[in-house]
Regions:
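Thiol-/selenol-based redox modules, centered on thioredoxin-like
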Residues: 154-155, 160-194
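Short, surface-exposed patches at the edges or C-terminal ends of soluble domains, predominantly
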Residues: 32, 95-100, 144, 185-194
Length: 194
């Protein structure tokens, strides 16, 4: 049995017409069945529920942190007590990330937030002021911190806050700083705010 040109054209037209409908049907079936890829492209821990900045009640050297928003993407690092060698390593990494962002570095602010009271030694404060002049210092009460951050407090975690004041990604020292840089570049490239 041979197909005439007329029938062959109809089959091609039907295939072209039905392919998008079939793809739509299959994608809907996969979505509602719960099937989805397991991996994500972000390197930090994506918080199930974003941490709203207004609930944290930060105070920074330039005033309450929520007054800064809407504004810039923010890398917020937490420290419990004085800034140790591990703390300074993460400060150095966040500064290098900011430098490597090049033209987008002005879209990102960095904060070091101390718990309960400013327990940084004079030597730490002097080192921060000389080596990290663009770093903002701040305070937060321990009971205002969400459990996700408290669990990682020993690692001087980073919290990435979007320009609208939502903490969305959490990073710890086990993750190389290049991973935070990759996430930031992706976010800055695709963001219409900040």
């Amino acid at each position: 049995m041979t197909l005439s040109k007329k029938n062959y054209g109809r089959i091609i037209a039907a295939a072209i017409f039905l392919t998008p409908i079939l793809l739509l049907f299959l994608s809907t079936a996969f979505y509602y069945s719960g099937y989805s890829p397991e991996g994500t492209v972000n390197k930090g821990t994506l918080l199930e529920k974003p941490i709203e900045l207004k609930n944290l009640k930060f105070t920074v050297d330039s005033g309450p942190l929520e007054n800064e928003f809407p504004g810039k993407w923010s890398i917020v690092q937490f420290v419990n007590g004085d800034c140790t060698e591990k703390c300074f390593q993460t400060l150095y990494s966040s500064r290098q990330i900011n430098i490597r962002l090049a033209k987008d570095s002005g879209r990102v602010a960095r904060y070091l937030i101390s718990l309960d009271s400013l327990k940084l030694s004079e030597a730490s404060l002097l080192k921060i002021k000389t080596e990290y002049p663009l770093l903002h210092l701040g305070l937060i009460e321990r009971n205002n911190l969400p459990q996700e951050v408290l669990n990682k407090l020993e690692d001087s975690p980073y919290l990435l806050i979007d320009p609208l004041g939502n903490g969305i990604l959490l990073y710890d020292l086990n993750l190389p700083s290049g991973e935070l840089l990759k996430d930031l570049k992706k976010l800055l490239q695709n963001s219409k705010i900040g």
